[in-house]
């Protein structure tokens, strides 16, 4: 493999990287999209996302689904994983966590389109689902439903 590739600037992939202590210090990395100009959808699913309630410090859990139609850039998946892990000890409400993740990705990638669904497990008996997207979905790309069922409990 040649010395200078689209992966040459990556700092985290292929090496030991500590989990960032906060989302603010987490470094998201991107690589050039080798299929730029071809409309397609990328999906990341994080079924065990966690953060902390900013009031009680109790853990909150969510199933996240991130879909995006890339332009020039792709997110490097290890850096995304570490970014999501950085929320483990971060206190914020469900809405803030979900939208912050979406906006950080938009700022980094400048995608054609992005959406994130945060399907939060109940706290205080109420599940909270949070949805953010950059605009109408492109018509020329297959974008599957997120497929996360409404919370039912034992009912």
Swiss-Prot record:
Identify the catalytic residues.
53 (thioimide intermediate), 60 (proton donor)
What EC number(s) does its UniProt record assign? 1.7.1.13
Q: Which cysteines are joined by disulfide bonds?
A: none
A GO molecular function annotation here is: preQ1 synthase activity
Q: Please give the pathway this protein is involved in.
A: tRNA modification; tRNA-queuosine biosynthesis
Q: Which reaction does it catalyse?
A: 7-aminomethyl-7-carbaguanine + 2 NADP(+) = 7-cyano-7-deazaguanine + 2 NADPH + 3 H(+)
Q: Where does substrate bind?
A: 75-77, 94-95
What Gene Ontology cellular component terms go with this record?
cytoplasm
Q: Which Pfam families match?
A: QueF
Q: Name one GO biological process term.
A: queuosine biosynthetic process
Q: What is its main location?
A: cytoplasm
Location(s), subcellular: Cytoplasm
Q: Which PANTHER family match?
A: NADPH-DEPENDENT 7-CYANO-7-DEAZAGUANINE REDUCTASE
Give the family per the record: Belongs to the GTP cyclohydrolase I family. QueF type 1 subfamily.
- Give the protein's biological function: Catalyzes the NADPH-dependent reduction of 7-cyano-7-deazaguanine (preQ0) to 7-aminomethyl-7-deazaguanine (preQ1).
Designated name of the protein: NADPH-dependent 7-cyano-7-deazaguanine reductase
What organism does this protein naturally occur in? Answer: Brucella abortus (strain 2308)
């Amino acid at each position: 493999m040649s010395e200078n590739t689209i992966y040459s600037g990556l700092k985290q992939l292929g090496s030991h990287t500590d989990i960032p202590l906060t989302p603010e210090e987490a470094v998201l990395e991107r690589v050039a999209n080798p299929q730029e100009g071809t409309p397609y959808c990328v999906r990341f699913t994080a079924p065990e996302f966690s953060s902390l309630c900013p009031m009680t410090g109790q853990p909150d859990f969510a199933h996240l689904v991130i879909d995006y139609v890339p332009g020039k850039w792709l997110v490097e998946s290890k850096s995304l994983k570490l970014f999501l892990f950085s929320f483990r000890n971060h206190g914020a409400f469900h809405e803030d966590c979900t939208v912050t993740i979406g906006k950080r990705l938009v700022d980094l990638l400048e995608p054609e389109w992005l959406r994130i669904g945060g399907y939060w497990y109940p706290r205080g008996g109420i599940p909270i689902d949070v949805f953010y997207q950059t605009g109408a979905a492109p018509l020329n790309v297959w974008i599957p439903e997120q497929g996360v069922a409404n919370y039912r409990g034992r009912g």
